[in-house]
Amino acid sequence: MASTKPLSRFWEWGKNIVCVGRNYADHVKEMRSTVLSEPVLFLKPSTAYAPEGSPVLMPAYCRNLHHEVELGVLLGRRGEAVPEAAAMDYVAGYALCLDMTARDVQDECKKKGLPWTLAKSFTSSCPVSAFVPKEKIPDPHALRLWLKVNGELRQEGKTSSMIFSIPYIISYVSKIITLEEGDLILTGTPKGVGAVKENDEIEAGIDGVVSMRFKVERSKY
């Protein structure tokens, strides 16, 4: 049965935001981390969504907010233990996404062996572009992502540099978390992550596909 929910408004009804960390070797190196044999996963709540036109809110407890530009994959149907060979059949489209990160908080969490929830899952920590139908991106592993802050290029990278491919990620995640229509998977960020502050303007894009702008504001809480 076809869904009556519009994927063009996925941020209004999608349930899960599953994020993949350490999926670009150059970013792993800049973070002084280690490439692992399996994807690093963490979650964001649906209240993390910030569609274009809304601000990126810097939590009151954060003093070092970082940008991470990523390709997001939108699921078009329910999937459980999806075979890697069939994984792309579950993709409805894509979105450009930011994984906003309270880096100072994340560093403390790492030192204490704690989850990254406070650093990664706050309100508006997942700004997203308009929905891009699957047909507009024939090869999601042949894209150039970029991000600017106040007009200065900070991040750029090619999705061909992913350590784990999109089909592998979908299959891997679906064996742990049952995926639903409208769920979003963030596929990792290339090198160049860095700090933003209140009143900064973030602009990001996928060459020839989509772009978006957000302004950073300080949250009251």
Curated annotation (Swiss-Prot):
A GO molecular-function annotation: oxaloacetate decarboxylase activity
UniProt-listed PANTHER family: ACYLPYRUVASE (PTHR11820), ACYLPYRUVASE FAHD1, MITOCHONDRIAL (PTHR11820:SF7)
Function comment: Tautomerase that converts enol-oxaloacetate, a strong inhibitor of succinate dehydrogenase, to the physiological keto form of oxaloacetate. It is thereby required to maximize aerobic respiration efficiency by preventing succinate dehydrogenase inhibition. Also acts as a weak oxaloacetate decarboxylase (ODx), catalyzing the decarboxylation of oxaloacetate (OAA) to pyruvate and CO(2), and as such is likely a regulatory enzyme in the TCA cycle. Also displays acylpyruvase activity, being able to hydrolyze acetylpyruvate and fumarylpyruvate in vitro.
Manner of cofactor binding, per the entry note: Requires a divalent metal cation for activity.
Entry-annotated residues carrying Phosphoserine: S37
A GO cellular component annotation in the UniProt record: cytosol
Cofactor(s) the protein requires to work: Mg(2+); Mn(2+)
Keyword Coiled coil annotated: no
Compartment(s) where it occurs, according to its Swiss-Prot or TrEMBL record: Mitochondrion; Cytoplasm, Cytosol
Record's subunit section: Homodimer.
Sequence positions bearing N6-succinyllysine: K112
Presequence boundaries: 1-24
Organism for this UniProt entry: Rattus norvegicus
Gene3D superfamilies linked to this entry: Fumarylacetoacetase-like, C-terminal domain (3.90.850.10)
Protein name according to UniProt: Oxaloacetate tautomerase FAHD1, mitochondrial
NCBIfam families: PRK10691.1
Positions of Mg(2+) binding: E68, E70, D99
